[in-house]
Amino acid sequence: MAGRLDEDLKDVTLLGNQNTKYLFEYSPEILEVFDNNHPNRDYFVKFNCPEFTSLCPKTGQPDFATIYISYIPEQRMVESKSLKLYLFSFRNHGDFHEDCMNVIMNDLIKLMDPRYIEVWGKFTPRGGISIDPYCNYGRPGTKYEQMADYRMMNHDLYPETIDNR
């Protein structure tokens, strides 16, 4: 199989762009997609995002997290540089940890319409407590809906040893 042609990537504008603009306000419109060349196969795509930051909506203090985004694509896939810039746009966004994870998941569902997706944030402790919100989605009426239920019930059965992240 030959690699992707330039015409296949016409909607991917941020990758390789040396004039990248970093947006400091929540910007879902920066997300870009490309076609999944393997839509007849189930497979996971996982992003490990260790530099996520947002702001506490009450105090304005920064929150830091590693975010794990895993999804099973259908027809469209998120382009990784646009995802990086999108996550960066949360830098000055004031929202609770749980809200940030659900907003990210909802934006990616709207963008890609994946078969399945999960977003897990592992935030560094503040005030001696770390918060690790997990959300997922499986396309209704399909095996992915059942998969989402199963993974929700079993996603964190083994407590981790916290070493201050």
Swiss-Prot record:
Pathway: tRNA modification; tRNA-queuosine biosynthesis. The keyword tRNA-binding does not apply. Keywords: Cytoplasm, NADP, Oxidoreductase, Queuosine biosynthesis. Its EC number is 1.7.1.13. Pfam families: QueF. One of its GO terms (biological process) is tRNA modification. It catalyses: 7-aminomethyl-7-carbaguanine + 2 NADP(+) = 7-cyano-7-deazaguanine + 2 NADPH + 3 H(+). GO terms for molecular function: preQ1 synthase activity. The keyword Cytoplasm applies. GO terms for cellular component: cytoplasm. Its main location: cytoplasm. The active site is at C56 (thioimide intermediate), D63 (proton donor). InterPro entries: GTP-CH-I_C/QueF, NADPH_dep_7-cyano-7-deazaG_red, QueF, QueF_type1. It is found in: Cytoplasm. Substrate binds at V78, E79, S80, H97, E98. Belongs to the GTP cyclohydrolase I family. QueF type 1 subfamily. NCBIfam families: QueF-II. Catalyzes the NADPH-dependent reduction of 7-cyano-7-deazaguanine (preQ0) to 7-aminomethyl-7-deazaguanine (preQ1). This is NADPH-dependent 7-cyano-7-deazaguanine reductase. It comes from Bacillus anthracis. The gene is queF.
